Structures are given as structure tokens and as C-alpha cells.
A protein has these predicted regions:
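AAA+ P-loop NTPase nucleotide-binding core of proteostasis motors
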Residues: 1-182
Length: 182
């Protein structure tokens, strides 16, 4: 991974450690292998790291661009339409289908800050229970997936301090924005 993703050695080591602990059977049975948030400005390799992780583990990458889920009604595309709405009988949502097809995957939710706040309820189901239930009652197992959220929260503040003489930031520039978002 370090050969393919430049400048993210610490993040790579943390992810690999978490995966090794999970593979050793030392993780909670009801939770995904790992849940990670990659924060930083555009172009630092957040999405690329997720892609390379899936490639190196030889597992499927299920990528969802969260800018497509900005409106409240678009959240139903992930878990399916509620009963009584058009499309309820057709199929489960995109996320449910991906997890049923590829239970061992890297689940990448790209640019999570652009999604509607209702997405957080779906994330809680995955992170707490290791599964998600669609609107039609179908359950998808997420215990063998690696959940990765990417965000640009705090990047604007970090970029302000990069010109001229300023104190170096120690990677915590987005903590306040992240807490406010969730």
C-alpha cells in the first residue's frame, strides 16, 4: 500500500493494524472489520487509499458518491423505497444489494459531508450492528466489510494556515467540524 499511496504511511499502518486484529478474531462479532474516516483536502489520497486497499486485499470496492444523496428522498436509493411508494416492490436499495452481492468488501462512502443527515442513521446501523435492514425487510450483513468515509471537513481551515509562517497543524484541524457535522 505504501508504494501506491504516497504520504499516508501513518494512516496505512493504522488501517493494516486494525485489519490484522480483526482477522485474528479479536474484534466484536457484531461490528464491521473496521470503520474509518479519512479527512483532508482534495488530492491527498483518501479515495485512492480505499481503492488500493480493496485491490491489495483482492476484495470488491463498493463506492458511493454521497453528493448523489443530498436530498432526503434520495436516501431511499440506498435502502429501498418505503412501503406504499413507487419502487418498493421492485428491489432493495443499492447499498443492500451491494452488501448482499459482496459481503466481503471495502464500503467507501465518498465525501460524506455532502450527504443528507439521515444517512447517519444508516451508518449507525452498520457500525453498531454490523448489518443493515432495507425497507423491504431484507438484511445485509456488513460484518465482513471495511467501512471508509471520506470528507473534506476542516480542509478549508487547514489550507488557510499553509501560506506564510504559521504553526504546523497536527492532523486535528477538522475535529471541530467533524463533531459539528455528526
Amino acid at each position: 500500500l505504501k508504494l501506491n499511496v504516497y504520504g499516508q504511511d501513518q494512516a496505512i499502518e493504522e488501517i493494516v493494524d486494525k485489519i490484522l486484529v480483526a482477522q485474528a478474531g479479536l474484534k466484536s462479532e457484531e461490528k464491521p472489520i473496521g470503520s474509518f474516516v479519512f479527512m483532508g483536502p482534495t488530492g491527498v489520497g483518501k479515495t485512492e487509499l480505499a481503492k488500493q486497499l480493496a485491490k491489495n486485499l483482492s476484495i470488491h470496492l463498493a463506492r458511493f458518491d454521497m453528493s448523489e444523496y443530498q436530498e432526503k428522498h434520495s436516501v431511499s436509493k440506498l435502502i429501498g423505497s418505503p412501503p406504499g411508494y413507487v419502487g418498493h416492490d421492485e428491489h432493495s436499495g443499492q447499498l443492500i444489494n451491494q452488501l448482499q452481492e459482496h459481503p466481503n468488501c471495502v464500503l467507501l462512502l465518498d465525501e460524506i459531508e455532502k450527504a443528507h443527515p439521515d444517512i447517519s442513521q444508516i451508518l449507525l446501523q452498520i457500525m453498531d450492528n454490523g448489518k443493515i435492514t432495507g425497507s423491504d425487510g431484507k438484511e445485509a450483513d456488513a460484518r465482513n466489510c471495511i467501512l471508509i468515509l471520506t470528507t473534506n471537513l476542516g480542509a478549508e481551515q487547514a489550507e488557510k494556515n499553509t501560506i506564510g509562517f504559521s504553526q504546523a497543524l497536527d492532523g486535528d484541524y477538522g475535529d471541530e467540524e467533524f463533531k459539528r457535522f455528526f
